[in-house]
């Protein structure tokens, strides 16, 4: 290696400084990797390269890491800071032998046998000049920009054309002390370490670039040869009384409508545009859990991203985040309604494949789509689809659509060798661009068809949207899931591959529910969602600022002390900084008088702000239910609280996709927290501390409308136990409308017919419908629900039910 202060290297570094723009993965190696700044460190690279080391030098300087040009001094010995697996590839002739680098490994290991206290950290570093995966059919471009083993001339061409798209990826540090203690220090271990390192670099490249891209027409030709599509073409020909060739042309049209046409060039251009867009829209994007997903990719998993659907921005945000986190943007299942010019062609080139809202029994379309999805999985492309099927208008997760999940499981059953893993993703925003439109649609206005004019209209309204949130939830390995649901599934399929197993549909439904549960398990309690939650629980949607800040501090402490799950995230800062942030976004109104400052929700947008509250209401459901018990019982013991929570939790779980493994333990942790915070006194019998009564009342109010719904349902069941599901749903909806009109309830979800359908399904499952067996339980839950309501609301419900069904 040339000396770092040589004229050549100084000139090279100066040139690269102007030509190269580098993105580091992960963004903070000290934070995200187990690098210990107190221990000696050596970088491991795949190929010796002057330009790569120059680029690495710029990065290490910025992070305060040792320079690759600075040798490691150990007890009088000088060791190179960089160890490479391969020498430089000359323009002509063979590459330099790797023996020199193997000797470096051996010498590093042997140092540990001589010095028991020594622990050198070996940090693998990968550099990528551009991220083109290449085509399955080789081309001149691939020859010129050969990225795996470039000569110095090819490397200069890569820097010239792709220098603005340089990625440097650091991996977890490997302890050579651990290697030496566990495996020894001889040359055999150095050989093994070299082999492992080669596999690591090969996998890292695939994670960063993805599999090679197929020629689109060659892909179509391959798919048309599949048995399922050939059979569907023959059936189409027979059923529609057209020629086989005509049916084949229809299949090609379907493929052309569906298939993505991924372009790395467009992705690079889009990356520049999206960087500008995010910087204009958002003050930051908060990411949690990306490292676990990167590891799944590295371990060879087929990844299927299943995010919640808040906004059309979701398509762009997740792909952008994955790109910057060193992973390939997925192929995204987009609704056919988005296939309009110019967005459709751009989405398609960015990896979108289009799906119709309904297959309408079209067997040929179904066969083509399934085979295309199978091909994506078989070739190793990451896939993304929205299990809700559409954007939520209320801020709550929608009931999942199971079609894509069923096709994914079918692909596993058809014999994908790699593990297939679903990665739930929570997407959140301080401002959703379409939220005002959602309010209009919920009020009865017809949904507008997507068009280029809507895009221009949205761009015109761009402003300060605060922050975005991308949290990756608990992954679901499909092979493991199937092993749990049907341990003999492989044997069953081997006996009769064409027979749909009896366990298939129940398993798909369970999987869909688990996906939604894991999405909510990764929720982000942000400044806007928390403030909306507090203010909408207050009378007139307004609080004195210091009171609001205290309530926010309480919720922040609760969510951090008793975390909902390890995947959820909580806003940084305190109540004051959160209120300041929300006011800077013009989300709330600040009014000052002689006494102080009042923060409120503008009555014109109160319904709109319920959208943000609903994003995280499940996080506070149990604390709020516990607070409600404490408010409505003069003295409330631990046993009573447990009993009431266990009565309502099955309904809360079904309605809010909640995921608490040990509910009694979670309840105890919340009670202990409330005692520690001084809100309550007692250890088994609790009373609210008088000076904290307002905080407990506000907390209890969060779930009040939910309890009102349950009171409606159980009062109906108590007075008429033989109600059918359809009758219960109809009458519950009718009484909810009446209650809302009398008591000013405006939240859209309060009147949502689909919500009452979800609850009726759960009640049927629990045995509470059309059965006298559980009548005592129904009466008990009705009494508990009534007790947790204000006297006026309770009386309205009781009187209305008796008027409707009284004898």
Swiss-Prot record:
Keyword annotations of the record: Acyltransferase, Cell inner membrane, Cell membrane, Lipid biosynthesis, Lipid metabolism, Membrane, Phospholipid biosynthesis, Phospholipid metabolism, Transferase
Coiled-coil ranges (or none): none
Membrane topology (UniProt): Peripheral membrane protein
Catalytic activity: sn-glycerol 3-phosphate + an acyl-CoA = a 1-acyl-sn-glycero-3-phosphate + CoA
Superkingdom of this protein's organism: Bacteria
Pathway: Phospholipid metabolism; CDP-diacylglycerol biosynthesis; CDP-diacylglycerol from sn-glycerol 3-phosphate: step 1/3
The protein's enzyme class: transferase
GO CC list: plasma membrane
A Gene Ontology BP annotation from the UniProt entry: CDP-diacylglycerol biosynthetic process
Known EC number: 2.3.1.15
UniProt subcellular location: Cell inner membrane
Single Gene Ontology MF annotation: glycerol-3-phosphate O-acyltransferase activity
Motif HXXXXD motif per UniProt: ranges: 308-313
HAMAP family per the UniProt record, alphabetical: Glyc3P_acyltrans (MF_00393)
Record's comment describing the protein's domains: The HXXXXD motif is essential for acyltransferase activity and may constitute the binding site for the phosphate moiety of the glycerol-3-phosphate.
Protein name: Glycerol-3-phosphate acyltransferase
Organism: Shewanella frigidimarina (strain NCIMB 400)
């Amino acid at each position: 290696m040339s000396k770092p202060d040589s004229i050549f290297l100084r000139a090279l570094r100066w040139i690269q400084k102007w030509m190269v723009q580098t993105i580091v993965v992960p963004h903070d190696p000290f934070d995200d990797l187990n690098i210990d700044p107190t221990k000696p460190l050596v970088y491991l690279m795949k190929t010796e390269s002057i330009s790569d080391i120059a680029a690495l030098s710029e990065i290490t300087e910025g992070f305060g890491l040792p320079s690759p040009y600075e040798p490691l001094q150990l007890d009088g010995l000088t060791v190179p800071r960089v160890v490479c697996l391969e020498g430089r590839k000359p323009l002509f002739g063979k590459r330099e032998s790797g023996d020199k680098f193997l000797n470096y490994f051996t010498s590093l290991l042997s140092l540990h046998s001589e010095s028991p206290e020594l622990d050198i950290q070996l940090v693998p570093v990968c550099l990528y000049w551009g991220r083109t995966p290449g085509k399955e059919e080789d081309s001149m471009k691939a020859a010129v920009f050969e990225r795996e083993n470039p000569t110095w001339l090819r490397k200069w061409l890569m820097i010239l054309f792709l220098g603005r798209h340089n990625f440097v990826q650091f991996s977890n540090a490997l302890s050579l002390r651990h290697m030496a203690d566990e495996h020894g220090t001889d040359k055999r271990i150095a050989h093994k370490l070299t082999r492992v390192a080669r596999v690591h670099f090969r996998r890292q490249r695939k994670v960063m670039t993805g599999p090679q891209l197929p020629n689109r027409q060659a892909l179509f030709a391959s798919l048309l040869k599949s048995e399922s599509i050939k059979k569907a073409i023959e059936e189409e020909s027979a059923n529609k009384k057209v020629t086989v060739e005509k049916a084949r042309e229809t299949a090609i049209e379907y493929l052309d409508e569906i298939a993505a046409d991924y372009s790395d060039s467009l992705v690079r251009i889009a990356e520049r545009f999206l960087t500008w867009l995010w910087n204009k829209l958002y003050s930051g994007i908060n990411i949690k859990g990306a490292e676990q997903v990167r590891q799944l990719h590295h371990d060879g998993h087929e990844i299927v991203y299943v995010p919640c659907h808040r906004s059309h921005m979701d398509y762009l945000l997740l792909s952008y985040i994955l790109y910057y986190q060193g992973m390939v943007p997925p192929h995204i299942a987009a609704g056919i309604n988005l296939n309009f010019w110019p967005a459709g062609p751009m989405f398609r080139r960015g990896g979108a494949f289009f799906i119709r809202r309904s297959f309408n029994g079209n067997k040929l379309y179904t066969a083509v789509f399934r085979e295309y999805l199978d091909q994506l999985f078989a070739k190793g492309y990451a896939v993304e689809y929205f299990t809700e099927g559409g954007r939520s208008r209320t801020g709550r997760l929608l009931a999942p659509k199971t079609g894509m999940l069923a096709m994914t499981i079918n692909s596993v059953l058809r014999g994908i060798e790699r593990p297939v893993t679903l990665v739930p993703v929570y997407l959140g925003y301080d401002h959703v661009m379409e939220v005002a439109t959602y309010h209009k649609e919920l009020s009865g206005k017809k949904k507008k068809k997507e068009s280029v004019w809507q895009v221009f209209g949205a761009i015109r309204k761009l402003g300060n949207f605060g922050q975005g949130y991308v949290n990756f939830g608990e992954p679901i390995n499909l092979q493991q899931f199937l092993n749990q649901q049907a341990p003999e599934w492989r044997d069953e399929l081997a006996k009769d591959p064409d027979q749909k197993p009896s366990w298939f549909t129940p398993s798909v439904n369970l999987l869909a529910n688990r996906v939604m549960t894991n999405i909510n398990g990764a929720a982000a309690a942000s400044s806007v969602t928390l403030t909306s939650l507090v203010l909408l629980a207050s009378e007139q949607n307004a609080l004195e600022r210091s009171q609001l800040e205290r309530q926010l501090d309480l919720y922040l402490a609760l969510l951090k002390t008793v975390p909902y799950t390890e995947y959820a995230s909580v806003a940084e800062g305190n109540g004051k900084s959160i209120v300041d942030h929300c006011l800077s976004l013009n989300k709330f109104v600040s009014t000052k008088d002689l006494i102080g400052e009042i923060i409120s929700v503008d009555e014109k947008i109160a319904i709109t702000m319920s959208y943000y509250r609903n994003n995280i209401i499940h996080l506070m459901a149990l604390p709020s239910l516990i607070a409600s018990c404490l408010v409505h019982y003069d003295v409330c013991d631990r046993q009573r609280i447990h009993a009431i929570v266990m009565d309502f939790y099955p309904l809360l779980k079904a309605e809010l996709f909640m995921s608490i493994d040990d509910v009694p333990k979670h309840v105890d942790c919340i009670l202990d927290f409330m005692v520690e915070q001084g809100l309550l006194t007692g250890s088994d019998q609790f009373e609210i501390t008088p000076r904290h009564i307002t905080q407990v009342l506000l907390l209890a109010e969060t779930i009040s409308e939910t309890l009102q719904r349950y009171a409606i349902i159980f009062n109906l069941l108590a007075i008429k136990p033989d109600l059918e599901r359809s009758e219960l749903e109809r009458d519950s909806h009718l009484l909810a409308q009446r209650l809302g009109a009398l008591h000013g309830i405006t939240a859209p979800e309060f009147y949502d017919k689909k919500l009452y359908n979800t609850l009726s399904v759960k009640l049927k499952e629990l045995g509470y419908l059309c059965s006298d067996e559980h009548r005592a339980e129904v009466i008990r839950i009705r009494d508990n629900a009534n007790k947790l309501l204000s006297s006026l609301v309770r009386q309205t419900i009781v009187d209305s039910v008796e008027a409707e069904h009284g004898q």
